[in-house]
Amino acid sequence: MDCKVVSLNEKDQFIPKIKSSDPVITGLFQYDAAQQISFEKRMSKENNGREAALANVIREYMNDLKLSSEQELNIQHLANGSKVVIGGQQAGLFGGPLYTFHKIFSIITLSKELTDTHKQQVVPVFWIAGEDHDFDEVNHTFVYNENHGSLHKVKYHTMEMPETTVSRYYPDKAELKQTLKTMFIHMKETVHTQGLLEICDRIIDQYDSWTDMFKALLHETFKAYGVLFIDAQFEPLRKMEAPMFKKILKKHQLLDDAFRATQKRTQNQGLKAMIQTDTNVHLFLHDENMRQLVSYDGKHFRLNKTDKKYIKEEIINIAENQPELFSNNVVTRPLMEEWLFNTVAFIGGPSEIKYWAELKDVFELFDVEMPIVMPRLRITYLNDRIEKLLSKYNIPLEKVLVDGVEGERSKFIREQASDQFIEKVEGMIEQQRRLYQDLLDEVAGNQNNINLVNKNNEIHIQQYDYLLKRYLLNIERENDISMKQFREIQETLHPMGGLQERIWNPLQILNDFGTDVFKPSTYPPLSYTFDHIIIKP
């Protein structure tokens, strides 16, 4: 597999500004992610003393998996005080978008580089956001149908949308297998298809909860790298979090004030507010099989779906004795994660690292230091066919990744059209505009006639526009094969107006290039970069 790094002319300059140590951006974080001194400081930080307990919890969480020797060793390293590189993601259908895998590769890559540079073991940890309850965000994925040259949405359907956390959701296995079958119908059959389908079927048969199936697929892919997995909703982990839940409940107003103040500061720097929430407690409570947002009304802590209410002593008692009923929101999850782990760096997507920028004062309030916040690696897969099509139409890869192919497609259509025809139509439009102005001069002062001339001109211009558009449409139809090839490029490299990794599913890559494609024996060794990586399987 070939691998190269390209620099894109990105529309969003947030990550390039992190790369260049822009003082406005770095001032929003505890550490400058582009400076080596930041890593030296984090590597030398004193541990929090929770590493042995965490190692036991992670071992318990992963005990339904057959651990690799690399994972066994990393659990020991964690128990002995090794620091971590960490990142997380929602449990998406069949692994979710490709960037989930790329986030894990980012964690693996950075932890290895830190281990090699500092001669200290750094452990890669992936945090599964099983506490989330927005099932609409994880119940679907997309598949590229090569025969049609188009993307198709594949969705796992439920009779009723679950309101509990995804870790507490147990999908209908027959329906899930039907969803899997639908996905494979759209994918081309390769020598890898049957083996991949058997792996997915086995996971569905062997595991019951939504997040356990997700975990099993990730484990199958990344176990050889020694990646450790933990679900935010895992009950033994929640028991570890009880002291922090109590602190959050006791300081909820100060927490909310700190968050709002930091968010306002980021907005004053010209950034858009990322975190949208009305709560002033920033926790959820599981009640009546629903994940319910907690808010404080001045006297009571209230739940948003059943309107149950608790005085402070009651809700703190729940945190003490039943911490598994609590879960974090977007504000408290990073805080809890860093309170638990001895983290060198957190790896996040472009939006994630922006919302971490709104939390600096929250970390300081709880005397928890924000780690180095790093953007994940961004990766695109380029197959031989698409590379040949780019060459055929002389389209720069970097341009497609940023802008798509619409501009190049329109340019191609104009090149196939008759210049004389287009010039004559455009000349007729210009002639009409001159005639229109002459007629307006003739009827000046007579509003009825002015309206008549305006309407007549509008009809003529519309007809000329229609003539030109239909002519170019006919050119498109005459070049149907080329139009299909432009669609192929678009749906592969810039689907739905964005990067491939945001839409495509990992199963597509596994089906095309083999079930070992992401394994260390096949996948190219990566180096951490702020730029874009192109991989040719």
Swiss-Prot record:
Keywords: Coiled coil, Ligase. Its EC number is 6.-.-.-. It holds the Pfam family Rossmann-like_BshC. It comes from the Bacteria. GO terms for molecular function: ligase activity. Residues 422-450 form a coiled coil. InterPro entries: Bacillithiol_biosynth_BshC, CC_BshC, Rossmann-like_BshC. NCBIfam families: thiol_BshC. Belongs to the BshC family. Involved in bacillithiol (BSH) biosynthesis. May catalyze the last step of the pathway, the addition of cysteine to glucosamine malate (GlcN-Mal) to generate BSH. This is Putative cysteine ligase BshC.
